[in-house]
UniProtKB/Swiss-Prot annotation:
Protein name: Large ribosomal subunit protein uL4
NCBIfam families: rplD_bact (TIGR03953)
Bias-annotated ranges (Polar residues): 58-68
Quaternary data: Part of the 50S ribosomal subunit.
UniProt-annotated stretches for the region Disordered: 52-79
GO molecular function, one term: structural constituent of ribosome
InterPro entries cross-referenced by the UniProt entry: Ribosomal_uL4 (IPR002136), Ribosomal_uL4-like (IPR013005), Ribosomal_uL4_dom_sf (IPR023574)
Keyword Ribosomal protein: yes
The species this protein was found in: Treponema denticola (strain ATCC 35405 / DSM 14222 / CIP 103919 / JCM 8153 / KCTC 15104)
Role according to the record: One of the primary rRNA binding proteins, this protein initially binds near the 5'-end of the 23S rRNA. It is important during the early stages of 50S assembly. It makes multiple contacts with different domains of the 23S rRNA in the assembled 50S subunit and ribosome.
Gene Ontology BP term (one): translation
Length: 211
């Protein structure tokens, strides 16, 4: 697959051949759905906790006699039917995380990259950094490719200057080529990929190098 490489000013510089085994696969909706759900589940804290009737503080004595009052039968004041009583089948702390097969996870990432490439939502840009670390300098670059849109920038490595410049920009995510996240990648309206990251992606996913 051929893609144009743009300068930070939005001008076309050259073309790059992207590996079809990464950017030209049939889109697998099921595995994408599975990968996004996996990430969201792994992020859940799962600390919600309620007390059952055995855990609520209070007396265990019977509040009134079983018969003769005309009222409902009560064993103690911690009954779930009473205000201040225990909770029936309430939530308890639990771990929502689960593992996903590595092959399925890799297929999900490649499917999302293929989807973005097929829908012209993937832009390859020459390698750049933001020496000043200023937000306004990065905004000027983004306006050429994803003005007002939710965007994802795929970097070759952890460029702290670019990340510092972009941390004030809403709906902007940074991903390293070897640590992609399905949720951010899928929901980003525009995926801006550095030229070096495009080459590394092909190598990382076990395919031939982009030319």
């Amino acid at each position: 697959m051929e893609k144009k490489v743009y300068s930070v000013d939005g001008k076309e510089l050259r073309t790059i051949n992207l590996d079809d085994k990464v950017f030209g696969l049939p889109v697998n909706d099921d595995v994408i759905y599975y990968a996004i759900n996996n990430e969201l589940a792994n992020k859940r804290v799962g600390t919600a906790c309620t007390k059952g009737r055995a855990e609520v503080h209070g007396s265990n004595s019977k509040p009134y006699s079983q018969k003769g009052t005309g009222r409902a039968r009560r064993g103690d004041k911690k009954s779930p039917l009473l205000v201040g009583g225990g909770t029936i089948f309430g939530p308890k702390p639990r771990d929502f995380s689960y593992s996903m097969p590595k092959k399925a996870k890799r297929l999900a990432m490649k499917s999302i990259l293929s989807l973005k490439a097929q829908n012209d939502r993937l832009v390859v840009v020459e390698d750049f950094t933001v020496e000043s670390g200023k937000t306004r300098d990065l905004v000027k670059i983004l306006d050429n490719f994803a003005k007002g849109e939710r965007a994802v920038i795929i970097l070759k490595d952890d460029d702290s200057l670019v990340k510092r410049a972009g941390r004030n920009i809403p709906h902007l995510s940074f991903l390293a080529y070897n640590r992609l996240r399905a949720h951010d990648l899928f929901y980003g309206r525009k995926v801006i990929m550095l030229e070096s990251a495009a080459k590394n992606l092909s190598e990382f996913y076990g395919c031939k190098e982009a030319e």
